[in-house]
């Protein structure tokens, strides 16, 4: 039972057995909470239930919640790898009561789990309580038989939890495990409490008060329970180790690292292995939840975490991407508990590999700059902020990475100077760029949502409807009245679809009761379920409370619906033609076309694209009715419906079934989707693929079209083919054969031309002597080759070297006004003459810089093709000494 997976399952199973609804972990991106970068505690997904904004789905629940603490208020990044219990990613086991049971049952359940299910020695357990909480000590004495010496009263806020300045709050009680007097450290509340002897394993929060402005507290009508047990911490206790990185999960990851990096996790390398293991988990789970590395927001936090791990990989000797090779080991350890890891494995590996390849290109140069700048500092002097900024801006070093590198050298960074340089860049960008400040912020929309409630969407079966205006925003702020110009409007109900799931928002028109007209150019979801209509008031004036008739552009929606439905059929076709590893990684569905990103490790061949087109069009011709079913996410996925990785689903989901049922009676495509679709597959009319290409490592993109746009594209292609056939004076059916014949003729002519150029160059054409000249006793073949470059130039040098026996060969190829130089030195002369040094002299003559290669073969280029002979003279001068 001591393995991490068993410990997790024991916790969840125990509470499930005791009437708790087992819920899967919520995604790491918080829903309906703009104040958090990431979910950082088990209660975060239930915040709206605790505040009363949402009704509980069950009276009690249990979860193992994915959490990330990196960036913002809760940031453990700097400590990870150097302490026993800091992580950027961790799992929080929790049980929750939403007004059901309270302190007595919470304590009884906790004590039963730790002493009976986990088998911890009760004599080695002690608890803390809030000093003003008189109930908790009595309950601990009654339930666990603890005496006063093992119930420690804490008067500080460490044992009082609050959600903020106002809202639900209450005292805490923490359970500690005593490792014994052989380990340094004192009990909680003592001067030595930071030692490793007494380890907190569980925090029970008794949510019993409402905090009001001014500090007043009143009793909640329905007190609740929120508990949090760090899985990694309790696993360390149960496995008898003092460091979280010594539990079985991390041992397996570090063993995989040792194999990948070819080093042992010992001595001063230990911290690097631990950093990589921790950051691998964070990186993988964030990518699985739909976040990719970028330069802003959550994507930037992910980039910082990835690059910190990759720098430690560089310290272990990695000079090419390696971290992605650890993903299979992580999936093996955690994929059963978190199936999204397996579903997203290809995307995770691709994202990590691509980021490391990008970082490797600048890491060496950045480290060189940092080393040089650090070596020039006086003792106690901080690294200048402008240097740290250059490392960030030019070499991709996040500030905390620079700080982490310098920490071991005892050097600090001038953070104020860094911020000054960053602000200067922002001002420059702002002066020359576009600000999006005209749109209302997410916080504003949350206030509207809290006060007015969600928008009721009526557009699944209609393109028209009536709504009452409940909010207006313009210039980035809420207003009561708008008279003209751009604005954002929210109604209590709307037939307008808001962009989500890749499907573009509706366009259309809204006419108010007094005749005012608003043109809708986009609809976006804000605060979870508000439909914000973005557009322009073209006549009249409107104010909140007014009613309006709302009309969606039906023709445009029909085109969007056809494209959206086509992506579902194409997704199924991709999995059939390419394999079941294909999963959707993103999409954008517009009226005129769509794009669809998916996991696949190689370009899709022409034959495969044709097969995919044929599959989809066969389903369109079958004209099967589209099926819609509303169910729970778990039941839908159990029934085989595909879910988009990283997507947040509510308690109920729409399951879309499309296409002809095959063997077993299962429809061709079954997916979770809240979008709007055609009623029959035949409504799509026709489907065609416009393009296929790579987006990033392991991710491909197909763009396509349906209906009138597809027909127009196909007609255009047919017309091009007809025009080409006419110009070549062949029947259309013979065009492929004629083009193939012309292509082969061109190849033959190119080969003949290349051979003629080679013979001309080797024979000393253009006035050069046919044989070698001799300079200081060294044979030299020096030629200008017109129209020759690249590999052909190198081949000429190799051929001439084989004939000259001993000597130096230089060819300057001139093509398109530019020059290329290739120089070869026979092996008997490489100690006296280096091709690399000779090519530098030649390159300077034609306006080039440097060059590269080996002592026996080197190449360079330059922009001045008319100075080819000067390049030859430069080599002659070098041989003369």
Swiss-Prot record:
Report any one BP term from Gene Ontology: alanyl-tRNA aminoacylation
Quick check: keyword Protein biosynthesis in the entry? yes
Q: Which organism is it from?
A: Hyphomonas neptunium (strain ATCC 15444)
What is the role of this chain? Answer: Catalyzes the attachment of alanine to tRNA(Ala) in a two-step reaction: alanine is first activated by ATP to form Ala-AMP and then transferred to the acceptor end of tRNA(Ala). Also edits incorrectly charged Ser-tRNA(Ala) and Gly-tRNA(Ala) via its editing domain.
Return the Pfam families for the record.
Answer: DHHA1, tRNA-synt_2c, tRNA_SAD
- Which cofactor is recorded for it? Zn(2+)
Query: Where do the record's region annotations for Disordered lie?
Result: 848-867
Which gene holds the coding sequence for this protein? alaS
Record text about domains? Consists of three domains; the N-terminal catalytic domain, the editing domain and the C-terminal C-Ala domain. The editing domain removes incorrectly charged amino acids, while the C-Ala domain, along with tRNA(Ala), serves as a bridge to cooperatively bring together the editing and aminoacylation centers thus stimulating deacylation of misacylated tRNAs.
Catalysed reaction(s) here are: tRNA(Ala) + L-alanine + ATP = L-alanyl-tRNA(Ala) + AMP + diphosphate
Q: Where does Zn(2+) bind?
A: 564, 568, 673, 677
Matching entries from InterPro entries are given as:
aa-tRNA-synth_II/BPL/LPL, Ala-tRNA-lgiase_IIc, Ala-tRNA-ligase_IIc_anticod-bd, Ala-tRNA-synth_IIc_core, Ala-tRNA-synth_IIc_N, Ala-tRNA_ligase, Ala_tRNA_ligase_euk/bac, DHHA1_dom
- EC top class named in words: ligase
Checking NCBIfam families in the record gives: alaS
Protein's UniProt name: Alanine--tRNA ligase
């Amino acid at each position: 039972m001591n393995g991490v997976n068993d410990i997790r399952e024991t916790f969840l199973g125990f509470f499930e057995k005791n009437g708790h609804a087992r819920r899967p972990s919520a995604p790491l991106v918080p829903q309906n909470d703009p104040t958090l970068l990431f979910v950082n505690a088990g209660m975060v997904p239930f915040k709206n239930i605790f505040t009363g904004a949402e009704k509980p789905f069950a009276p009690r629940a249990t979860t193992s919640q994915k959490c990330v603490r990196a960036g913002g208020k809760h940031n453990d990044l700097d400590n990870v790898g150097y302490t026993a219990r800091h992580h950027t990613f961790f799992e929080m086991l929790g049980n929750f009561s939403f007004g059901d049971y309270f302190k007595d049952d919470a304590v009884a359940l906790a004590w039963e789990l730790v002493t009976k299910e986990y088998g911890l020695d009760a004599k080695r357990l002690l608890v803390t309580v809030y000093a003003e909480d008189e109930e908790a000590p009595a309950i601990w004495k009654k339930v666990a038989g603890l005496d006063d010496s093992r119930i420690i009263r804490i008067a500080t806020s460490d044992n009082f939890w609050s959600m903020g300045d106002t809202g639900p709050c209450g005292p805490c009680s923490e359970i500690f495990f005593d490792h014994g007097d052989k380990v340094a450290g004192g009990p909680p509340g003592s001067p030595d409490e930071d030692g490793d002897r007494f380890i907190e394993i569980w925090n029970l929060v008794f949510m019993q008060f409402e905090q009001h402005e001014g500090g007043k507290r009143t009793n909640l009508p329905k007190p609740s329970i929120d508990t949090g047990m760090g899985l990694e911490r309790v696993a360390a206790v149960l496995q008898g180790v003092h460091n979280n990185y010594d539990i079985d999960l991390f041992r397996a990851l570090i063993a995989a690292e040792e194999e990948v990096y070819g080093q042992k996790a010992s001595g001063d390398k230990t911290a690097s292995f631990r950093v990589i293991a921790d950051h691998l988990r964070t990186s993988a789970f964030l990518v699985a939840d739909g976040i990719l590395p970028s330069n802003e927001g959550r994507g930037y936090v992910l980039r910082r975490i990835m690059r910190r791990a990759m720098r430690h990989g560089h310290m272990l000797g990695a000079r090419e991407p390696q971290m992605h090779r650890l993903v299979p080991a992580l999936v093996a350890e955690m994929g059963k508990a978190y199936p999204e890891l397996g579903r997203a494995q290809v995307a995770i590996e691709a994202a990590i590999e691509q980021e490391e390849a990008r970082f490797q290109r600048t890491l060496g140069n950045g480290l060189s700059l940092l080393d040089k700048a650090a070596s020039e500092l006086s003792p106690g002097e901080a690294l200048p902020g402008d240097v740290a900024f250059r490392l960030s801006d030019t070499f991709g070093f996040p500030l905390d990475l620079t700080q982490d590198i310098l920490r071991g050298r005892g050097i600090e960074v001038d953070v104020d100077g860094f911020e000054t340089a960053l602000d200067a860049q922002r001002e420059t960008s702002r002066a020359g760029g576009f600000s999006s400040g005209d749109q209302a912020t997410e916080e504003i929309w949350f206030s509207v949502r809290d006060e007015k409630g969600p928008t009721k969407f009526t557009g699944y079966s209609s393109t028209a409807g009536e709504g009452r205006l409940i909010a207006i925003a313009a210039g980035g702020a809420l207003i009561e009245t708008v008279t003209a110009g751009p604005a954002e409007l929210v109604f209590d109900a709307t037939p307008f679809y808001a962009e989500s799931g890749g499907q573009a928002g509706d366009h259309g028109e809204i006419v108010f009761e007094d005749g005012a007209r608003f043109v809708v150019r986009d609809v976006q979801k804000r605060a979870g379920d508000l439909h914000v209509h973005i557009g322009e008031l073209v006549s009249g004036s409107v104010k909140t409370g007014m009613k309006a008739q709302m009309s969606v552009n039906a023709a445009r929606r029909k085109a969007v619906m056809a494209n959206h439905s086509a992506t579902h059929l194409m997704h199924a076709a991709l999995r059939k033609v390419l394999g079941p590893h294909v999963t959707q990684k993103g999409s954008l569905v517009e009226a005129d076309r769509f794009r669809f990103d998916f996991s696949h490790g190689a370009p899709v061949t022409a034959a495969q694209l044709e097969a995919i087109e044929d599959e989809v069009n066969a389903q369109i011709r079958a004209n099967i009715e589209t099926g819609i079913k509303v169910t729970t996410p778990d039941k839908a996925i159990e029934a085989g419906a595909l879910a988009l990785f990283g997507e947040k689903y509510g308690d109920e989901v729409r399951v879309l079934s499309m296409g002809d049922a095959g063997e077993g009676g299962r429809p061709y495509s079954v997916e979770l989707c809240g979008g709007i679709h055609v009623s029959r597959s035949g409504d799509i009319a026709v489907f065609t693929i416009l393009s296929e290409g790579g987006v990033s490592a392991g991710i491909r993109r197909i763009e396509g079209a349906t209906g009138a746009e597809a027909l127009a594209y196909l007609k255009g292609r047919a017309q091009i083919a007809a025009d080409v056939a006419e110009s070549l004076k062949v029947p259309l059916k013979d065009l492929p054969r004629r083009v193939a014949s012309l292509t082969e003729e061109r190849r033959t002519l190119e080969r003949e031309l290349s051979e003629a150029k080679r013979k001309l160059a080797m024979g000393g054409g253009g006035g050069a002597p046919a044989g070698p000249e001799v300079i200081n006793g060294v044979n030299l073949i020096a030629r200008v080759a017109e129209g020759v470059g690249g590999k052909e130039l190198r081949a000429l040098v190799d051929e001439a070297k084989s004939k000259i026996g001993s000597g130096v060969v230089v060819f300057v190829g001139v093509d398109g006004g530019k020059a290329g130089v290739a120089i070869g030195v026979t092996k008997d002369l490489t100690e006296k003459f280096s091709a690399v040094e000779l090519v530098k002299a030649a390159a300077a003559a034609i306006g080039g810089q440097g060059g590269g290669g080996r002592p026996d073969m080197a190449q360079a280029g330059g922009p001045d093709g008319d100075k080819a002979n000067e390049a030859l003279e430069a080599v002659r001068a070098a041989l003369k000494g």
